[in-house]
């Protein structure tokens, strides 16, 4: 259950959408150069505690669902900032995976990633935020 195969990208070379076609060309070139594509991306999460404020810095273009959930679950003064330390891609939420669409399926081509993230993305990110928050003494309310 990894990235699309080289053959899958070759089948996209006749794609009418120029961006999708160019993405397929880049992924084929990467297969030929490296013999494989990345199956995971190192995602940056940073948490700072400044007095009563907990600043959560998340990489990428994070959707509002993350901020709403973290504020609800961590309580207190929580500030969630996206575009922090890396602009890896659009970061969809679990709700969006159920809906599908551009952000979940197609946006990866503009960030030069081989394919969409997996539906458990939100849980992995939120879980790591909670782990880091506990280390700083932030107690979850939920």
Task: Identify what each model region corresponds to.
Residues 1-142:
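Non-catalytic substrate/cofactor recognition surfaces at enzyme active-site rims
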């Amino acid at each position: 259950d990894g990235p699309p195969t080289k053959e899958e990208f070759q089948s996209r070379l006749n794609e009418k959408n120029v961006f999708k076609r160019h993405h397929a060309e880049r992924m084929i070139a990467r297969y030929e150069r490296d013999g494989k594509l990345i199956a995971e991306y190192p995602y940056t999460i940073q948490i700072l505690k400044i007095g009563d404020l907990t600043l959560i810095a998340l990489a990428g273009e994070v959707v509002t669902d993350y901020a709403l959930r973290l504020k609800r679950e961590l309580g207190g003064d929580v500030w969630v900032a996206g575009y922090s330390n890396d602009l890896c891609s659009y970061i969809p939420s679990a709700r969006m995976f159920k809906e599908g669409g551009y952000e979940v399926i197609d946006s990866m081509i503009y960030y030069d990633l081989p394919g969409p993230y997996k539906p458990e993305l939100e849980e992995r990110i939120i879980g790591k935020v909670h782990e880091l928050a506990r280390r700083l003494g932030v107690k979850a309310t939920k």
